[in-house]
Amino acid sequence: MGARASVLSGGKLDAWEKIRLRPGGKKKYRLKHLVWASRELERFALDPGLLETSEGCRKIIGQLQPSLQTGSEELKSLYNTIAVLYYVHQKVEVKDTKEALEKLEEEQNKGRQKTQQATAEKGVSQNYPIVQNLQGQMVHQSLSPRTLNAWVKVIEEKAFSPEVIPMFSALSEGATPQDLNTMLNTVGGHQAAMQMLKDTINEEAAEWDRLHPTQAGPIPPGQIREPRGSDIAGTTSTLQEQIQWMTGNPPVPVGEMYKRWIILGLNKIVRMYSPVGILDIRQGPKEPFRDYVDRFFKTLRAEQATQEVKGWMTDTLLVQNANPDCKTILKALGPGATLEEMMTACQGVGGPSHKARVLAEAMSQATNTAIMMQKSNFKGQRRIVKCFNCGKEGHIAKNCRAPRKKGCWKCGREGHQMKDCTERQAKFFRENLAFQQGEARKLHPEQARAVSPASRELQVRGGDNPISEAGAERRGTVPSLSFPQITLWQRPLVTIRVGGQLKEALLDTGADDTVLEDVNLPGKWKPKMIGGIGGFIKVKQYDSILIEICGHRAIGTVLVGPTPVNIIGRNMLTQIGCTLHFPISPIETVPVKLKPGMDGPKVKQWPLTEEKIKALTEICMEMEKEGKISKIGPENPYNTPVFAIKKKDSTKWRKLVDFRELNKRTQDFWEVQLGIPHPAGLKKKKSVTVLDVGDAYFSVPLDKDFRKYTASTIPSTNNETPGVRYQYNVLPQGWKGSPAIFQYSMTKILDPFRAKNPDIVIYQYMDDLYVGSDLEIGQHRTKIEELREHLLKWGLTTPDKKHQKEPPFLWMGYELHPDKWTVQPIQLPDKDSWTVNDIQKLVGKLNWASQIYPGIKVKQLCKLLRGAKALTDIVPLTTEAELELAENREILKEPVHGAYYDPSKDLIAEIQKQGQGQWTYQIYQEPFKNLKTGKYAKMRSAHTNDVKQLTEAVQKISLESIVIWGKTPKFRLPILKETWDTWWTEYWQATWIPEWEFVNTPPLVKLWYQLETEPIVGAETFYVDGASNRETKKGKAGYVTDRGRQKAVSLTETTNQKAELQAIQLALQDSGSEVNIVTDSQYALGIIQAQPDKSESELVNQIIEQLIKKEKVYLSWVPAHKGIGGNEQVDKLVSAGIRKVLFLDGIDKAQEEHEKYHNNWRAMASDFNIPAVVAKEIVASCDKCQLKGEAMHGQVDCSPGIWQLDCTHLEGKIILVAVHVASGYLEAEVIPAETGQETAYFLLKLAGRWPVKTIHTDNGTNFTSATVKAACWWAGIQQEFGIPYNPQSQGVVESMNKELKKIIGQIRDQAEHLKTAVQMAVFIHNFKRKGGIGGYSAGERTIDIIATDIQTRELQKQIIKIQNFRVYYRDSRDPVWKGPAKLLWKGEGAVVIQDNSEIKVVPRRKAKIIRDYGKQMAGDDCVAGRQDED
């Protein structure tokens, strides 16, 4: 007993004994209740000790609660007692049991909401989360190609506008640093932006390292290391480590951190790309409030301000800068209104019809008592309309200006709006409404409704002569009719009055007659038999009987007999104007605008033949009946031409509208889908169905405000009558917005179904749907029917004609089988003569087939299409093209199938060479089961070789794989590692390619010949030259050898360049297996040194053939006209009567300078005023400068303070090199040892000479040492290690190392010690070589960049200061002050201002300049003004 009583002690026991058992009752809780409770707990096998803490009580409550519904009275009492005890422990004051239970329920509801939110957040679409596999390990699911593709497209379309940030945030949900880097990689081309992003990432990483110093000593076993900044950025951490950090306990969310850093960087980029200030965002007089809010928040996101400031901006500026109409409403809402309330309240305000609505409202309130119905069948007064929202009379909810009432206007519950309400109301009569306000939904004639056969409504309309909706609108009779609207969710049963009796009857549009049961009618009757679904029944026929239906009267024949249900047939329904309506689905319209400053199209209709006019009239009448188009009057000034064509293989006509002009004027749309889905990316599914959406575009409504621009006119023959004019209510065929809006609507419609059935895969492309699942066929088909019903609810039909249930499925031009796919059968036409159009179609078919048929070639066929030819021109097939076509026919004879993708297996890509610059490839996961195949045949340059082409093919395949599967395959290439390495070392600027292995599939890729770097001893030397006369096109080519041989041939129709090549060809043809050739043509040398093995030029191909036959070839260059023996002789040989000799001063000086400094051609051309071609030839003739071609130049956009540092080795010594990235300026020094001490000393020297903000190094021990860190800290330099998303992050300094070594090689013999040679080389590089941006030398460029940076910074300060001012000014004769205008510049005597978009110069005496925040005018005569302006 004692133990049990000790549950509460002291103060708590006092509180316990003050609580009443019932509200207002006398009895209170006592100690005995606790003793009883602990005994009861034992009965329920619960520990009585739990009563001693609030946590224990909560556990007990959790156990008892599920049993409360079915439990005994004792159980409920126990639950109540413990609830009270729980609050006593919590020290929360409760008066009685009821209050404790209410509090408990409230607390539990809050908890539930939180968990729901949390699960909702968990349920957010995570594109590539870390998931748990069957073994319970956390594994990574890589980015989906759609995500990557969407991200690339966002950047392409939006550049770096503010929307990019939320898009990035959404797409990178749950991503690891590696995923984020992949995303950044795909947009790495935007180098300026990436540089800014890199800077931010490095700043944040350094800050992280500063706040989280590395822990001393080794890491205990079983524990993972703490991430460094570079680990978070994914540079120095592996994917496995990232997963461990993200899923550890406690977790380190490296992905989220890195994402935050990137978003910080993106903010800076957006700021740079979209520099609009939030103060400039004002709502236009007619701009919808929603659009204004969108612009406001788009700009707010880009503002660099704290969250508090942004909050203040939202609270004050949003209202302050709204237009007067909206401002009135927003101020009435008061300061605490949420954004949603604001948007709801301002709905419709600001639109063009707003003023009219306000007027109509005022008029209807003033006059509605006096309005009587004008129609013959309506007796009595018109009903007063009442608003669903505010309950006031005189307007409807659509026009209500009060804040929108929360919850549904139909059922009163919160969480949805009336249009989404699932409560199906059968009682729709105005007498007994389901709404408290007592007003059914009013259907305005202006709601021109388009038709789809999905959801039908009955409208009971008054009057014998129903007027057309458009007509009603024009004649201004909008307020005269008010119809009940009956939805068909349930049977349309209504109460009718017949013969003084009330009966319930079914409105049946399918019945011809009205049939009632058990009703006594006056007058005579005659017997009749009527047929129904259940057979024939005998009835009595009464004529001229009055029936009252929904307040409308009709007189007609009524049949009385034993009918299962009373039926009102069409004989009565037509009299009361009842119509069937097929409203277009409740799909939201997407607002569409014209391009700014443009008006709609006004293109005249061209004349049409009588049969076309007749066909169009019929089609339009049909479309109007279905509500797809509406008639319009002459007040619409727009027009688009319309015409008709016969449908393929049919006598039926088809209406075509030429929307080209409207398309030019319509805003641009974001292409929702970036490409078509590919079957190789489909995962294998047990059950598959393919559906097609019928009349796809016509099921989606067009924005009401845009419809007027789609106007067109059907003319009459011989202008007998004025043309009939129509406009579209739905998405028109041929209009540029239709595909994007349809795709967007379709996605929104499918989203709920996808969310409900996550295991069902739906690929949607326009109106084609592929649905796959792993369900049994029966269950799968049930799901398909669910999907079809779901689509039908929205008005989208899926016709049975195109509903494919059994394989093979025809989808998107493919044929899908359960375990394989292929392209739909391809028939190549047989023709005697081919036109350009025929060949284009043929090439298209073959390209389509090449996705799965390996070995398809189209190069020769494409050659036939070269040159500008008309589509109908006849093209004779060349022998090669005929052969190619025959080969393709053979390949297509045997059907080939592709496999489906299995995410658990690796992708492998294999490439084969087909010859003539064509390549074929297969991507597979298991041998002989290709996922897809393809071909590559691009010649990026006129002369190329196989290795170059192979790298290009690999890159094309990598990109294709990322798009389809989201990852790159492993490559199997027909090239030996040695050949690749030779190419790689020779051409150090060759591109990176992914992981690959050698596969021996002939023909192997090889470098067919190699040029010697030194002259061949003992081989004959040929001096070659060619010349041509520009006017006559005649020329000569020839050679002279060191052994006295010579030859010259005459050429016609040639050029200098061709003649030079011809001379080389002669020399190769007439020489032995080893030869030295000396040319004076830089052009010829350039081509041959790139070692091409194929060319578009026949002559180069002949030279290649000769080169391959030779054992050794040495090719050298000498400058022309320099008195070089053999060269001079051959020059005379070929110049006779051909070449005009050109003598230039300055060549000698340039050559001398070059021998000393080996400066590049740009420096010589500029310093000695010689033509570029001569300067290039001097460089090329120098054997020391002829080691390699010039580097291919990329574009690195870099800020002025960045330097890259690296150590390189030469002659066993260490050279420390520093490059100023923006200019290429070099500092280098031989250091005694690769230590931190030496590096730090070098760094301080560098910082003492130049403004160094950031250094970029690799992870060498000397750079990562504490000494260097200390030096960086002292000098205020930020240190970076590699760019996270760029494998060649040290590219600039790496290429400079090579450049430096090259220069040292050229001047090494001029210096005894290496350290002297290094400094000489640095001098040459910095001051004797010109080129790049501005044609400066690196030294000049550095100084220019730094000076410009200082000027820009100062100017920026001035501009920022100046932009804070506003100017009020007076024009020449107008005494009124205008303004405020923006101050652009302030000079001594005048200011430059911008008013609206006009820029003006105003004298100082006529301008008053004020700061933006003040209302005080500050002119020249005001002290405050003068202080402000400075």
Curated annotation (Swiss-Prot):
Positions marked as site (Cis/trans isomerization of proline peptide bond): G217, P218
Domain Peptidase A2: 503-572
Region (Interaction with host CALM1): 8-43
Region spans: Interaction with membrane phosphatidylinositol 4,5-bisphosphate and RNA: 14-33
Region (Dimerization of protease): 484-488, 532-538, 571-583
ZnF (CCHC-type) residues: 385-402, 406-423
Names of the cofactor(s): Mg(2+)
Segments forming domain RNase H type-1: 1016-1139
Phosphotyrosine: residues carrying this PTM: Y128
Positions of Zn(2+) binding: H1154, H1158, C1182, C1185
Chain spans, region Interaction with human PPIA/CYPA and NUP153: 185-223
Record comment: activity regulation: Protease: The viral protease is inhibited by many synthetic protease inhibitors (PIs), such as amprenavir, atazanavir, indinavir, loprinavir, nelfinavir, ritonavir and saquinavir. Use of protease inhibitors in tritherapy regimens permit more ambitious therapeutic strategies. Reverse transcriptase/ribonuclease H: RT can be inhibited either by nucleoside RT inhibitors (NRTIs) or by non nucleoside RT inhibitors (NNRTIs).
Reactions it catalyzes: Specific for a P1 residue that is hydrophobic, and P1' variable, but often Pro; Endohydrolysis of RNA in RNA/DNA hybrids. Three different cleavage modes: 1. sequence-specific internal cleavage of RNA. Human immunodeficiency virus type 1 and Moloney murine leukemia virus enzymes prefer to cleave the RNA strand one nucleotide away from the RNA-DNA junction. 2. RNA 5'-end directed cleavage 13-19 nucleotides from the RNA end. 3. DNA 3'-end directed cleavage 15-20 nucleotides away from the primer terminus; 3'-end directed exonucleolytic cleavage of viral RNA-DNA hybrid; DNA(n) + a 2'-deoxyribonucleoside 5'-triphosphate = DNA(n+1) + diphosphate
Residues carrying the site annotation Essential for RT p66/p51 heterodimerization: W983, W996
Region annotated Interaction with host AP3D1, chain positions: 12-19
EC nos: 3.4.23.16, 2.7.7.49, 2.7.7.7, 3.1.26.13
Motif Tryptophan repeat motif boundaries: 980-996
Function according to Swiss-Prot or TrEMBL: Integrase catalyzes viral DNA integration into the host chromosome, by performing a series of DNA cutting and joining reactions. This enzyme activity takes place after virion entry into a cell and reverse transcription of the RNA genome in dsDNA. The first step in the integration process is 3' processing. This step requires a complex comprising the viral genome, matrix protein, Vpr and integrase. This complex is called the pre-integration complex (PIC). The integrase protein removes 2 nucleotides from each 3' end of the viral DNA, leaving recessed CA OH's at the 3' ends.
Record's miscellaneous remark: HIV-1 lineages are divided in three main groups, M (for Major), O (for Outlier), and N (for New, or Non-M, Non-O). The vast majority of strains found worldwide belong to the group M. Group O seems to be endemic to and largely confined to Cameroon and neighboring countries in West Central Africa, where these viruses represent a small minority of HIV-1 strains. The group N is represented by a limited number of isolates from Cameroonian persons. The group M is further subdivided in 9 clades or subtypes (A to D, F to H, J and K).
The protein's name in its UniProt record: Gag-Pol polyprotein
Lineage summary: Viruses, Riboviria, Pararnavirae, Artverviricota, Revtraviricetes
